[in-house]
A protein has these predicted regions:
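Extracytosolic (periplasmic/ER-lumenal) interhelical loops and adjacent juxtamembrane/interface segments
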Residues: 64-109
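C-terminal TM-helix exit segments that contain a strictly Trp-centered aromatic cap at the helix terminus
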Residues: 50-66, 84
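Structural signal for the C-terminal ends of transmembrane alpha-helices
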Residues: 23-33, 126-133
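A hydrophobic membrane-anchoring alpha-helix module
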Residues: 93-136
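Interfacial segments of alpha-helical transmembrane regions
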Residues: 31-53, 123
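Immediate flanking context of iron-sulfur cluster ligation sites
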Residues: 1-3, 22-25, 61-64, 89-90
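Loop-to-helix transition at the N-terminal end of transmembrane alpha-helices
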Residues: 2-17
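Alpha-helical transmembrane segments of integral membrane proteins
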Residues: 12, 41-45, 114
Length: 136
């Protein structure tokens, strides 16, 4: 597998939040009076995915050298427990730098593709919210 940098981990956090929002929304809309909250849930998911567009777009911009990344993203940032264990066992483990894409496809890094995917998810969420608005 590819070791994630600090900004990669921040991108994952947004998806954990989206998953939590979606699970809570699925439960709430089944409660009495809950169906009225479907539209709001869709708008909230759109907002979460819009944050994802920002985080992933920022990371892609760092990779393309459009702007500098955070100081902690220079390849020596946060160390995970697994990395610390490997280091204690004699292996030198270094967090990857945020400005070095670990993988690219069709000219886009994983951060670039995440930006595209997040934009699509914003579109789906907005479309679902507007569809719910039309039902009420």
């Amino acid at each position: 597998g590819l070791a994630p940098c600090e900004l990669c981990l921040k991108q994952r956090t947004v998806y954990w939040v989206a998953g939590a929002v979606a699970i809570v929304a699925m439960i709430v809309v089944r409660l009495p009076g809950g169906p009225r909250l479907r539209e709001a849930s869709c708008w909230l998911l759109a907002l979460v995915f819009l944050v994802s567009v920002g985080v992933a777009g920022y990371h892609a911009g760092v990779e393309w050298k459009f702007w500098p990344g955070p100081q902690s993203c220079s390849g020596g940032g946060t160390v995970t427990v697994a990395a610390l264990r490997d280091l204690l066992n004699g292996g030198g483990v270094k967090m990857p730098a945020c400005d070095q894409p670990a993988w690219t496809f069709a000219g886009l890094s994983m951060a670039g593709w995440n930006t595209v995917a997040s934009m699509i998810l914003v579109g789906f969420s907005v479309a679902a919210a507007l569809r719910e608005r039309g039902r009420t």
